[in-house]
A protein has these predicted regions:
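Non-catalytic interface/targeting segments
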Residues: 1-53, 62, 110-122
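Short glycine-/small-residue-rich flexible loop motifs, especially phosphate/cofactor-binding loops
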Residues: 19, 83, 105
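Short active-site-adjacent helix-start/loop capping segments
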Residues: 42-44, 75-78, 104
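Short beta->alpha connector loops
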Residues: 51, 73-75, 99
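Short, charged beta->alpha transition segments
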Residues: 52-58, 104-105
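Mid-chain, well-packed structural core segment of small domains
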Residues: 59-95
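C-terminal structural segments of small proteins and small subunits
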Residues: 90-120
């Protein structure tokens, strides 16, 4: 599915998604990753069951106002112990399926928000 009709003025754009992949800057990505308007971490937790607290701690250096957690094909919410570092730092967390996270990231990034999308792509 194509996400946007124009390319927003950000460096890293999610331009599409489908079962088992996202399109980042036009390139097909078939593994979990973290993306912000200025940053890409191409290796992250491979799946939901692998999530550890340190995965979320890695996101703190990006200083986002909001983290979108794409949990794969279905919505799941991580245990609060895993995400407490974000809450303690005053960073919002929204969990949703990965396709919804892609759509939400595109909107927020195009508005100039300090958003990070942590996308699980099993």
């Amino acid at each position: 599915m194509k996400l946007i009709n124009h390319i927003p003025d950000v460096t890293n754009v999610l331009t599409g998604h489908g079962p088992g992949f996202v399109l980042l800057n036009g390139q097909r990505i078939e593994h979990s990753m973290v993306v912000s308007p200025e940053y890409i971490l191409r290796e992250w937790a491979p799946d939901f069951s692998s999530l550890k607290e340190n995965h979320f701690e890695q996101l703190l250096i990006l200083k986002p106002e909001l983290v979108l957690l794409g949990t794969g094909a279905v919505f799941r919410f991580p245990h609060p112990a895993l995400t407490s570092c974000l809450i303690n730092a005053g960073i919002g967390l929204e969990a949703m399926d990965t396709q919804a996270a892609c759509r939400t990231y595109s909107v927020l990034a195009s508005e100039g928000r300090r958003v990070v999308a942590a996308l699980l792509i099993p």
